[in-house]
Design a protein with these regions (language model features):
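Loop/helix patches that line or flank the sugar-binding groove of alpha-linked glycan CAZymes
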Residues: 1-140, 144-151
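Short, ordered coil/turn segments that flank beta-strands lining enzyme active or ligand-binding pockets
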Residues: 134, 170-171, 185
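Short, surface-exposed beta-strand/loop "edge" segments at domain boundaries and coil↔beta transitions
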Residues: 136-138, 173-177
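Beta-strand-rich binding/interaction modules
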Residues: 149-171
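C-terminal beta-strand-rich structural cap/linker in extracellular carbohydrate-active enzymes
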Residues: 176-190
Length: 190
């Protein structure tokens, strides 16, 4: 009996659309998925092709005769350096943004692998959870719009402490009032 071993597609290409078909949110959707993964409890693992936003390698499938080769591209060093140096390249955009997310994670005590985590219930298209450092001195609310429409978010809905100033660790945006309602762009993570 045949059983599927794996999905034969690169993760980057798998996230280039929804059930409605391909769309223009591919890079944003891909980075959103990684931002959520990097903020979750535990020790994250990142496949090199996710770090680089590697697309399906159809030529490798054809040459090897193995479908699983589709997500096992072998980069030529000079070609990779060239792609990463072009700001408009999806590879460059993904690499820079995931590096930023890794740095944010590294700097925050609440992202310790064993730090507390609780899921927030904020609606169907908003994925959220709360992380708290092991010494309980830092709280981080990770909020991601996992849909392709902008969504309002009332800061009061995530139980922010009213006397604290809150900062989006990715954008640097400050929020001074828990009464604020902010708009989260499609696939944006705060």
């Amino acid at each position: 009996q045949n059983k599927p071993y794996e999905i034969n597609i690169s993760l980057f290409d798998a996230l280039q659309g929804t059930t409605a078909g391909p769309d223009s949110w591919g890079v944003e959707r891909f980075v959103c998925a990684h931002a959520i993964m990097l903020a979750l409890e535990g020790i994250p693992g990142i496949y090199i092709h996710s770090l680089l936003g590697t697309r399906n390698d159809y030529e490798r499938v054809e040459n090897s005769g193995h479908y699983r080769a589709i997500n096992r591209h072998q980069w030529d060093y000079d070609a990779l350096v060239s792609e990463l140096s072009r700001e408009e390249s999806s590879h460059s955009q993904v690499f820079a943004r995931i590096k930023t997310l890794l740095e944010v994670r590294r700097q925050q005590a609440a992202f310790h692998p064993n730090a507390t985590q609780f899921t927030l219930h904020l609606g169907d298209a908003i994925f959220g959870f709360w992380r708290q450092s092991m010494d309980r001195r830092q709280s981080i609310f990770c909020i991601g719009n996992v849909g392709n429409e902008p969504l309002p978010l009332a800061l009061a809905d995530i139980n922010l402490i009213g006397t604290d100033d809150w900062v989006d660790l990715i954008s640097g945006q400050h929020y001074h009032s828990r009464e604020q309602v902010i708009e989260i762009a499609p696939y944006q993570v705060l």
